[in-house]
Amino acid sequence: MGNRTTTTFTTLTGETEHMEKKLLLGAEAVAQGAIDAGISGVYAYPGTPSTEITEYIQRATEGNQPSVHSRWATNEKTAFEAALGVSYSGRRSLVCMKHVGLNVAADAFMNAAITGVHGGLVLVVADDPSMHSSQNEQDSRYYGRFAMIPILEPSNQQEAYEMV
């Protein structure tokens, strides 16, 4: 669950405070950000590297609570629809998939962009725009532009945590 260290520092007012630091990989930072943001559901279709996000949440103490519904889906479309349903109920959800999975979820994704959401909904797509380690080249940012939704591109683990 990442390496943890505790740092003690003195504030400008002279008070001593303790801050826990976690050293996380990018997928772990996304997962921890979702947990700390208070997600109610995480849904995914297995496919590396997006699988690690859901697995981290399932292993984490905070993510393994009855208040966090976590499921592997039959495909990316059903994963997106489950997360969208949680969002329609006013709660926060996360859905994770590989780049080719967004093709499968495209119908639900585009319709959600039109109808909107009521709670938070974060879609994490693990892209491979230069076909480094996958069977095809795809840049899912074009889906985001077409749907006119915000596209977040963290450049490090801290940004990934904060953006989620």
Task: Describe these PLM feature segments.
Residues V164:
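Conformationally flexible catalytic loops at phosphate/diphosphate-handling active centers
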Residues T7-Q157:
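Thiamine diphosphate
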